[in-house]
Amino acid sequence: MNINSPDPSFVYLLPVPVQAGRTGSLGAVVYALSDQATASLKPELICEYLPERILPSPSYLFAQGLSPHRLRHGLKARSFTKRIKEIVSNRIIVTWDAALLPLIDVNAVRCFLQPLIPLSRGIISLRTLAHAAFFFGQLESGPLKALEKSAELYDVFAGQEIRSPERRLKELIGIGRMLREKHGALFDYQLRGRKNKLGVLEYSYLNSAPISLVNDEGECGIMRVLRKEAAGFTVLFISCKQVDKPRLLNLNEYGGEIIAPLSVFTKERCMRLGFDLQGALLTMSKYDPSSLLKAYEAVSHNDNPLYAFFSSMNNADRAFYEYSCHHEELSDEISDLSEAFKKRVFLYTGDHERGKLSSEQYRLYESLSLQSLQTRYDAYMHETKLLVNRADENDPAEAALIQAIAAYPESL
């Protein structure tokens, strides 16, 4: 295997959130098609236009080395989303933490386009892969939660670049190259993509068979699929560390889990992990999860960030959304929309297609934007002051970034 040759089948990609939460605002993505040669790598940052009414999180901007002024010159929402679609379609997405990928689809449906992650061939979470390499391979230590700290831990990138999304992508590439070089079988197994993952899950579901799981939180154990739905699979999971405490999980297409046949738990690996495999299998065979399934059904919706968006639609909302997904312009049919959906359309139009607003609508949009800014302003400035106290006073790049963050609201 030549790890230095380009492989167009996958793409290194990091979402760049500018607000907290799985439904927060996405400010940019940084990506590179899979040229493994770090020295020649040229990451590309694509920013999305940030409307005036949305104040980003200063700590998120600072942590990623992103000036808010770059976002003011980004692509409008639908153009941004269509560009990401070109990047991820029919490719494996290689990222650090799969938990951030739903932001891409939340962003897509907010501008009335289809979710993008299902168009990919699958997800490789390098953080999860590093956990698996520690459990099943020869990696001496598991990863840390933060990409930057893990890059230091594995000594894969020693550049002196200032903090930036582009630097973070280079660190991701460095960890990816290390894992592919030293743990190629694991990496290549994940390159089989979503089709292989679904095949193993289907096998478990149809045969009530236990299989292995390394999840995105770095837990290793066995599981059995109990229920298959459009939103994902409900599984019974038993961790290596707690063989007497089974619990339910929901697995969907946003996860970077490593799912494999039970045979990966060889006798030697079980001894090294301190895993009582036979005890776990016995617990699984005797456990009746039916009492938990009904209660879990409502909770599991929290794992799907798009659930709230789609579940609240009426028929007119759905018709508007379907039309807008497949046309350059949004639908003109808005009279029968629900009030909540109508507000979404109004704010989107004000954010990205302001010329379509009447004078009265424009005044209303300006009023709503001002209210939004005033609501968030004090928290924004407080967060910025905390950054000043934490910053390295001897680092001019940090000082310049904080100054740009502090001055941003006054520029609006």
Residue ranges and their predicted role:
Residues 1-40:
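Entry/capping segment at the start of metal-dependent catalytic domains
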Residues 15-17, 51, 99, 128:
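Short, flexible loop/turn elements at secondary-structure junctions
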